[in-house]
Amino acid sequence: MVTGTFTILNSSGFHARPAGLFVVTASRFRSVIKVASGKQTANGKSILSLMLLGATPGAEITIEAQGEDEAEALNALAELINGRFGEEP
């Protein structure tokens, strides 16, 4: 199992488009992916679950990946988040 903590950098947080991009990226991997924000935990492969986290800009989230491709999954998701989900700075 690998984990990482990240700050949501895009201007709108985990709304539909970023959550959708996250799910598309997470679904490329076999690992189980969980995302936590505050005391809530979400399935990283469920757009509705991620949106219900209510992670706003500046929020910290923790991603946990467990499985055969866990490191690759975490790296891909980190790149997506740190790249502001493709949003210009």
Regions from the PLM with identified roles:
Residues M1, R30-S31, K39, R84-F85, ...:
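A composition-driven signal for long, intrinsically disordered, charge-rich low-complexity tracts
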Residues M1-T5, E60-T62:
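Intrinsic-disorder/low-complexity, polar/charged segments enriched in Ser/Thr/Lys/Arg/Asp/Glu/Gln
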Residues T7-L48, L52-P57:
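Compact, glycine-rich, soluble single-domain proteins
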Residues T56-P89:
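C-terminal structural segments of small proteins and small subunits
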